[in-house]
């Protein structure tokens, strides 16, 4: 079976890295097309032996790109088109149906209560999403929370499949040599207690709250490491300066060595205002670090003393950080339930199985004729 993954861009981000992991474990022949910004993850996928094409879009609204994508899909003879992220859902769904692709699947990686991938949920955004959803056979929600948000938004429950993000445990395993090396690289004392955050420097991640909460607790033996880059980095650096902890807060910038960066930490903090899954928290736990988080749907129903949900307020977060630090550095320890539920191999099998079920259903429909009163995506009956 031939599968084409359509994604908005391939800069470093959770959805982009998740796609790479899926490609490494799928049993189907798979290609990738990015609407624009091939970025570092495109290089990673190419390095793995995958094929990545850049559609070359330069604006969000570019109708000729729809024609280019349709021709690319038709020429590739793909059985499945799988779209990831909002913009690629709009273009990918439409192009796939225009190209006559049998199966169209979407994964919704990042839908919050009020925002969809950092864009406000306006009537226009919703109309485009729901309108092109008519072209889709199924939408993968990465958590129950995402599923419920999609249903409230107007997506039919029968079209939603809950398949969580997968975690490659070998990719994020603890490495003592890497711990020593990273601490040397950034001038962090080997015996210091290092708190860390990881992700795109975006307001919704609330790294400013972490800086404010941790600032009074920092000294030469208690440091904060911020891993990631983004437009608000100057604001965060100013926040650290205003709090008088410039020398105690280290900005590592964008990094691709996730396991090494996590290995350098003693406590992980995730203070996002809204979260659809919480992959970074799972990665930290898989590395053996205790984690404090404000929201992490991926941990719903998982009992562990290695992760604790904390208040999203300044004083509340500060108290929880102080309490964790007071107990000293915890030994590295995994959470077996996470491996059982979120291993990338099992998750990818579920996605591959979904493709095959949908393809079989489409084949049966063609053999036995269309079902009555079931309109197709662009007119007529399926």
What are these regions (language model features)?
Residues 5-67, 149, 231:
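N-terminal strand-loop element at the rim of the active site
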Residues 254, 273:
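Aromatic "clamp/platform" in nucleotide-sugar-dependent glycosyltransferases that forms part
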């Amino acid at each position: 079976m031939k599968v084409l993954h359509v994604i908005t861009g391939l800069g470093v981000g959770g959805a982009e890295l998740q796609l790479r992991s899926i490609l490494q474990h799928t049993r189907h022949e798979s290609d990738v097309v990015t609407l624009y910004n091939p970025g570092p993850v495109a290089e990673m996928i190419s390095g793995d032996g995958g094929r990545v094409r850049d559609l070359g879009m330069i604006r969000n609204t570019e109708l000729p790109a729809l024609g280019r994508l349709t021709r690319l899909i038709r020429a590739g003879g793909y059985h499945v088109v799988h779209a990831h992220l909002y913009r690629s859902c709009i273009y990918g769904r439409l192009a796939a149906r225009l190209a006559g692709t049998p199966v169209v699947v979407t994964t919704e990686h990042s839908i919050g209560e009020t925002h969809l991938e950092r864009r406000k949920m306006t009537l226009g955004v919703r109309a485009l999403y729901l309108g092109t959803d008519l072209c889709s056979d199924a939408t993968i929600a990465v958590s129950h929370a995402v599923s419920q948000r999609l249903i409230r938004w107007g997506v039919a429950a029968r079209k939603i499949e809950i398949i969580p993000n997968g975690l490659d445990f070998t990719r994020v395993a603890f490495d003592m040599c890497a711990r020593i090396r990273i601490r040397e690289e950034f001038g962090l004392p080997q015996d210091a207690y290092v708190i860390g955050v990881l992700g795109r420097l975006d307001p919704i991640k609330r790294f400013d709250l972490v800086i404010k909460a941790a600032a009074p607790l920092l000294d030469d033996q208690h440091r904060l490491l911020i891993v990631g880059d983004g437009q608000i980095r100057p604001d965060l650096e100013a926040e650290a300066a205003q709090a008088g902890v410039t020398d105690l807060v280290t900005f590592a910038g964008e990094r691709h060595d996730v396991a090494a960066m996590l290995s350098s930490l003693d406590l992980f903090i995730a203070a996002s205002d809204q979260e659809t899954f919480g992959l970074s928290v799972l990665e930290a736990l898989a590395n053996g670090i205790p984690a404090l988080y404000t929201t992490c749907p991926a941990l719903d129903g998982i009992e562990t003393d290695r992760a604790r949900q904390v208040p999203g307020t300044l004083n509340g977060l500060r108290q929880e950080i102080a309490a964790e630090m007071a107990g000293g550095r915890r030994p590295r320890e995994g959470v077996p339930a996470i491996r059982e539920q979120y291993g990338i191999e099992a998750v990818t099998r579920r996605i591959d199985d979904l493709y095959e079920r949908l393809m079989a259903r489409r084949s049966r429909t063609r053999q036995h004729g269309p079902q009555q009163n079931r309109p197709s995506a662009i007119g007529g009956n399926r």
